[in-house]
Each structure stands twice: as C-alpha cells, then as structure tokens.
Amino acid sequence: LVAIDKTLFLETESETGETVGYGVPIAAYPSEAGKVIVNSPGSGELKDGREDRWRNLGLYLQKRGLASLVTFNAPRPDFQVQLEWEPYSYQGASWNKILIESLSHTIDWSLENAKELCGNASPDIYLTGFSSGGSSVGAVAHRYPSVKRILLLSTYDSVGDPFYEGVTAFTGDIYLVYGDQDPMAGYLARILRTGKFAAKSFLVREAPECGHRFDGEANTKLLTQAFHWAFEGDNSQPLNPGN
C-alpha cells in the first residue's frame, strides 16, 4: 500500500465579500482496517507534521492495519490583512474560517472515498487535531453523524465560539491529551471538565514531562499511545514516555 496525495481546490469569501481561492493538500494512508482517522495539524505544521510525525504515524497505522489516516493542511496565514478579531488571515479571509472549512472538505473527501481508503464504504470516522487543529475538530465534529470519536491534542480554543458550540453539541466520545508543561491547554481542559456536554464520554489524560508541541522522541511515542488510547479503546494504561 502506498500513500495517496491529493490537493483540493476550494473557495471561500474574504471579509469584504471577495472570492478567495486556496488549495488544501491531503495525504492519505489506505488500509483495510474499515475505519478512517482524519487529522488536523497545528497552525505551524504542514500535512506531514513537524519532523514528519503525522506521515510516520500514518505509515505506522497503515502497516499494522489499525486505521487509515488522512492528514491535510490549510494554507499558511499570509498576514496581508490584519483582521480586528483574530491574529491570522489569508488573502483577507479569516484563517479560522478557512481552517474549519478545510477540515470539513477533507472529511467530505474521506467519506466520498471511504471504500478506497479503508475497504468500507460507510466507516466510522474518527477526528484528531493538534493545537489549533484540535480547535477546528471541536468545531465541526458534531456536523457528521459518522464521526464517533475525537482526540484533542494540546488543544486551544483558537477558533473561538464555534469550538465551544461544536464540542458541547458532539454526541460521541471525546478524548483530550495535553502536556503537564502546557498551562494553556491544561486550563482549557479544566474549563471543559466543568461544562455541560452532549458527549457520550469525556476522558482526559495529562502527559508527563511534556510541553505544548510534544517535542522529542519520548513525546512522539506519547502521541502514538494517545492514538491507541482514543481509537482502540484501551483506557487501562497511563500515558508513559517509557512505554
């Protein structure tokens, strides 16, 4: 099995009503696992991830027949226009909006091509997102009945109200992992724990000796463990960089 590389060509509107075209590169790692994981990287990452971590994870899941990973990236912010209400923009359009739309179109593409991706035309879809990518996952997961679980990694509420509105409306299982050296993500985890959710379950793990970016070999292993924990239902083992 090999990776599938694809670029979606999309359009959105700038804040002044002009049409903005943009491309969303996708990498997919097909398997016969019968389930698809759509990954939304952080704002500073391309689809393959920092040090190719999402590419390596896609190959890992593919080789073991565990799941078919689909990963993408929205266009990088270009700072041509400074919007009043958010720090990032792309050709005058809200970057948060573009990120959410990019994820939605990637999910749509994954559903349309599910048979080729995982051997199942109507699979369960799992979503995962890192940092701002996790914020976009929280915003859109509730729109898709086939999305059963989401994994939020080092997640901030960067897309704003759509994140809170979406994550509280999602009816599947929510898994959240953050590093013990990432106070902002830890603060959001505490806020979410006190909120009212439609979710079937809400489980939180704190990764030891870990910062926001999950840098280093040990923390990369923690990311892999987090995927096993969330998407294989193994809730028995703590996240441990020594495993």
Feature annotation, model-predicted:
Residues T128-V137:
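Gly/Ala-rich beta-loop-alpha elbow adjacent to hydrolase catalytic centers
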Residues F79-E84, S89, K200-N243:
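C-terminal catalytic histidine-bearing segment of alpha/beta-hydrolase fold enzymes
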Residues G186-S201:
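Conserved loop-alpha-helix segment in the C-terminal half of the alpha/beta-hydrolase fold
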Residues D180-G186:
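Acidic catalytic loop of the alpha/beta-hydrolase fold
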Residues L1-A27:
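A domain-start/cap signature at the N-terminus of enzymes
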Residues S146-S158:
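A conserved short beta-strand
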Residues F170, L176-Y178:
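Short beta-strand/loop motif that positions the catalytic acidic residue
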Residues G17-N120:
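Serine-hydrolase catalytic machinery in alpha/beta-hydrolase-like enzymes
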